[in-house]
Amino acid sequence: MASRKDTLVRRASRVRRQIKAVANGRPRLSVHRSSKNIYAQIIDDVAGKTIASASTLDTDLRFSLKTGADTEAATAVGKLLAERASKAGVKDVVFDRGAFIYHGRIKALAEAAREGGLNF
């Protein structure tokens, strides 16, 4: 029987394989969610570089949020990431939800990033 971590890795690799098929050179917006925080970064897979990143642990957000584990925090991270991406000149990305379902905090971050100007 596969462990929880094995199933998460398998699911994430399945999602990433689908993303590589449709990326067409666009950077990838990768999201990670833990029980206390949420992290997002825009990665250029061709160059192997991180273009922009944001999380609830950033000094811009850390003390202004009640907790890093709710949809309000995810929305703030999405807006901050979109702002940093626009400064870096990125508008079109591919959304990589990893092994997480598109619901709750993941959905809130994605919608806030779209409102901030990212296209995916």
Curated annotation (Swiss-Prot):
S-S pairs: none
Taxon lineage: Bacteria, Pseudomonadati, Pseudomonadota, Alphaproteobacteria, Hyphomicrobiales
GO process terms (BP): translation
Job of this protein: This is one of the proteins that bind and probably mediate the attachment of the 5S RNA into the large ribosomal subunit, where it forms part of the central protuberance.
Matching CDD domains: Ribosomal_L18_L5e
NCBIfam families per UniProt: L18_bact
Cellular component terms per the entry's GO annotation: cytosolic large ribosomal subunit
Assigned keywords, A-Z: Ribonucleoprotein, Ribosomal protein, RNA-binding, rRNA-binding
Entry's Gene Ontology molecular function annotations: 5S rRNA binding; structural constituent of ribosome
HAMAP family noted in UniProt: Ribosomal_uL18_B
Pfam family, one: Ribosomal_L18p
Species of origin: Sinorhizobium medicae (strain WSM419)
Name this polypeptide is given: Large ribosomal subunit protein uL18
Top-level taxon in the UniProt lineage: Bacteria
Family: Belongs to the universal ribosomal protein uL18 family.
Subunit field text: Part of the 50S ribosomal subunit; part of the 5S rRNA/L5/L18/L25 subcomplex. Contacts the 5S and 23S rRNAs.
